[in-house]
């Protein structure tokens, strides 16, 4: 006899929809408290199974990964945006594309990007005047977009900034788990869907312009865009310009908003924890003095590393993963039907007191070698894990640390909101603009 996981019951359509849509974060937490590590529920007619124990998560992402695909829930939501790009593609096609793109994220390449990252950060910060209030999350989103455009696609974002303005946020909002329409098709003409359509059109225009300009260029830089264009132009492959568009959209959307959030949450956490901030500043003074940070400095900055790691624990930019079982599976003692949508919430696991003492406190000091050695593998997984782990993990971590270090060397950030609150969009968005006053140090 099959044993389904426990979970909240209710009318089949409304099911758990209302409470979840009202507040996905506390609903996830409540389910974990009431029903345990594996919880089944029905949201807008779809079976969701939340899995929140590191051992089960490891089975899904690593040991049994061949039985869990990216799934129809994610494809319905994101298929339009990222198409057959790396995030959603599967099987042999995914494997070949991953191998093709991976070298762009190797250590030697990253070293070349580091200087551009610091240069772009300085240029952005030069626009800030001491004493003014800025919207930190938007500033950092523009910055990471500019960094990505320059390092991976060799173009200057200023040419396209107008078209890009708010694109990522609009697209991320379309996925907001707190809106009933997220569970409905994107073609239904709600105002949010219309904004989303416009953002998508802008994104496509920019991407196709960039491809065209690069093809017309005589001496192309040796970057991710060059690698992708060479693959499409290679008669041995049957890749098309559409594949190219999908990979570019995937990298842009997967890579800049997440990194901007990691930076936002690190800087706001430090601004609210003066002791932790003082330790990071003292370390930067000692190791860097007035010099710009370089990639070789990073291993000498353990406090900065812990500050970022802890911010990504407390506020994981990708706050939940989704997978779909492609055959009936057993998770722990429960049966999970074929086609169930699994939700694997970093939000719950990173705040679980079984793994993290005082889980809601920002405590960078917890990240000692002994603590890390004692932590179950999948109690902390801001970049996912297994074969589908984030291809941009090293890039994103390096970028976050270089940007945070460069900004702290120049400014003090005074957080202007009473609290941070969050929206469960595609990524963990701040619910309100993050206003901070910047003062030159
Ligand atoms: C620093 C912040 C970042 C975070 C928190 C983050 C998080 C993640 C997570 C959780 C996944 C797995 C998604 C899933 O399996 O459903 C992922 C995948 C991915 N990320 Fe990131 N990411 C970050 C930065 C980046 C950067 C900088 C890039 C590109 C430059 C990038 C590109 C991608 C791509 C292409 C995938 C799909 C990989 C595949 O399935 O083969 N990410 N990321």
Q: For each predicted feature, which ranges?
A:
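Short, small-residue alpha-helix embedded
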Residues: 258-271, 403
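Cytochrome P450 I-helix active-site segment
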Residues: 5-10, 114, 118, 219-226, ...
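N-terminal membrane-proximal hinge/A-helix region immediately C-terminal to the signal-anchor transmembrane segment
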Residues: 1-96, 111-124, 143, 155-159, ...
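Cytochrome P450 heme-binding "Cys pocket" and the immediately downstream C-terminal segment
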Residues: 274-276, 373-375, 393-429
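Cytochrome P450 heme-thiolate monooxygenase catalytic core
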Residues: 70-75, 93-94, 109-261
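Conserved cytochrome P450 K-helix/beta-meander segment immediately N-terminal to the heme-binding cysteine loop
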Residues: 66, 322, 344-371
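Conserved cytochrome P450 K-helix E-x-x-R motif and the immediately C-terminal K′/meander segment
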Residues: 17-36, 291-332
């Amino acid at each position: 006899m099959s044993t389904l996981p426990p979970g909240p019951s209710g009318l089949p359509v409304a099911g758990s929809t209302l409470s979840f849509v009202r507040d996905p974060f506390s609903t996830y937490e409540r389910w974990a408290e009431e029903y345990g590590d594996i919880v089944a529920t029905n949201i807008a007619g779809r079976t969701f199974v939340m899995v929140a124990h590191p051992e089960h998560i490891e089975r899904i992402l690593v040991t049994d990964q061949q039985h869990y695909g990216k799934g129809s829930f994610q494809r319905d939501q994101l298929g339009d945006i990222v198409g057959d790009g790396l995030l959603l593609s599967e099987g042999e096609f995914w494997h070949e594309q991953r191998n093709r793109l991976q070298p762009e994220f190797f250590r030697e390449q990253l070293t070349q990007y580091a200087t551009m990252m610091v240069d772009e950060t300085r240029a952005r910060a030069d626009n800030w005047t001491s004493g003014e209030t800025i919207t930190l999350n938007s500033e950092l989103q523009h910055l990471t977009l500019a960094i990505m455009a320059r390092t991976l696609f060799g173009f200057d974002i200023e040419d396209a900034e107008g078209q890009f303005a708010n694109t990522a946020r609009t697209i991320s909002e379309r996925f907001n788990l707190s809106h009933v329409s997220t569970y409905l098709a994107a073609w239904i003409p709600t105002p949010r869907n219309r904004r989303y359509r416009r953002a998508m059109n802008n994104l496509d225009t920019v991407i196709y312009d960039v491809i065209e300009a690069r093809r017309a260029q005589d001496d192309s830089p040796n970057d991710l865009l060059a690698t992708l264009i060479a693959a499409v132009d290679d008669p041995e492959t049957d890749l098309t310009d559409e594949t190219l568009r999908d990979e570019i959209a995937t990298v842009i959307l997967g890579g800049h908003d997440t990194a901007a959030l990691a930076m936002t949450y690190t800087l706001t956490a430090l601004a609210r924890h003066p002791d932790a901030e003082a330790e990071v500043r003292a370390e930067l003074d000692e190791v860097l003095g007035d010099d710009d940070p370089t990639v070789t400095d990073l291993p000498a900055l353990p406090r900065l590393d812990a500050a970022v790691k802890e911010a990504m624990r407390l506020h994981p930019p990708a706050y939940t993963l989704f997978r779909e079982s492609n055959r009936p599976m057993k998770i722990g003692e429960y049966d999970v039907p074929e086609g169930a949508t699994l939700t694997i919430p970093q939000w719950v696991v990173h705040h679980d007191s079984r793994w993290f003492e005082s889980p809601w406190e920002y405590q960078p000091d917890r990240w000692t070698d002994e603590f890390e050695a004692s932590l179950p593998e999948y109690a902390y997984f801001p970049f996912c894990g297994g074969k589908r782990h984030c291809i941009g993990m090293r890039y994103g971590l390096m970028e976050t640390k270089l940007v945070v270090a460069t900004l702290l060397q120049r400014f003090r950030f005074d957080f202007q909101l009473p609290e941070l609150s969050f929206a469960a969009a595609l990524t963990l968005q701040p619910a309100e603009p993050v206003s901070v006053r910047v003062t030159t140090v």
